[in-house]
């Protein structure tokens, strides 16, 4: 649609590799501060103690784990939580974002999360963990459809589970360049076929557009970079046009000011 094209025009260039993608190789502590600032922006009076506890818990649980990029694993859940905060989601969802991988990738259990935090947060994390266990095979349409049905069922139980999973997938797509080419194609295709339609169904255009954009980047790189170039040119032309109008307005204002002073 025209709206999606305009949003893509504003965002696509900034997603390229030579531009800083979200929070790559930034210290965990600075990311945590960014997360808190983002939450307080839309919920100034929120009690951050639970978020802080979740951050420390996840940091301890993932200690020693490293992503393929070489950065500490805790960077990933922090970035997921920041994406959720940008969508202005509730504190429990932010906490679930921070903890979303501890059951799958560490020794921590759902029962421990329920005990340390709450049953509500434990259910969110458990839901995300179960979604992560769904397999996808692009060559088997029936399996793909079944995955979609399961995701819709999970969405019906608590939409926040899907929100965390979408944020998780978005950050993984933003850092997909560190994966093998085979993994890039598999993950990008899965994103295009499963996650983009879910984001569209939920009406989250911001996530849907970026997921579409990043999928195209790996599935059809020639088309993607051609689009990036065209958008960059179009944006440059538009900026020059706007600057020309501004310059004319400034010149006119100066001229009027000069004429006024001459009459005094």
Where are these regions (language model features)?
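Active-site helical microenvironments for divalent-metal-assisted chemistry
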Residues: 1-256, 261
């Amino acid at each position: 649609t025209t709206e999606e094209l305009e949003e893509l025009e504003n965002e696509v260039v900034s997603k390229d590799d030579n531009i800083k993608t979200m929070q790559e190789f930034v210290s965990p502590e600075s990311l945590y501060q960014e997360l808190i600032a983002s939450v307080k922006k839309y919920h100034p009076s929120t009690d951050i103690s639970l978020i802080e506890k979740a951050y420390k818990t996840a940091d301890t649980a993932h200690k020693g784990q490293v992503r393929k990029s070489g950065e500490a694993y805790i960077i990933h859940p922090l970035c997921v939580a920041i994406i959720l905060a940008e969508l202005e989601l509730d504190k429990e969802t932010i906490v679930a974002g921070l903890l979303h991988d501890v059951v799958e990738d560490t020794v921590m259990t759902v029962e421990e999360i329920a005990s340390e935090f709450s049953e509500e947060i434990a259910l969110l994390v458990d839901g995300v963990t179960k979604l992560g266990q769904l397999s996808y095979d692009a060559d088997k349409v029936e399996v793909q459809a079944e995955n979609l049905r399961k995701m819709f069922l999970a969405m019906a139980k608590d939409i926040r589970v899907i929100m965390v999973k979408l944020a998780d997938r978005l950050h993984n797509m933003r850092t997909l360049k560190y994966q093998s080419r085979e993994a890039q194609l598999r993950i990008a295709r899965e994103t295009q076929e499963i996650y983009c339609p879910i984001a569209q169904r939920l009406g989250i255009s911001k996530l849907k557009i970026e997921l579409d954009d990043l999928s195209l980047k790996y599935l059809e790189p020639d088309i993607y970079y051609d689009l990036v170039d065209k958008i960059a040119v179009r944006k440059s032309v538009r900026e020059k046009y706007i600057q020309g109008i501004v310059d004319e307005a400034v010149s006119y204002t100066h001229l009027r000011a000069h004429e006024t002073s001459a009459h005094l």
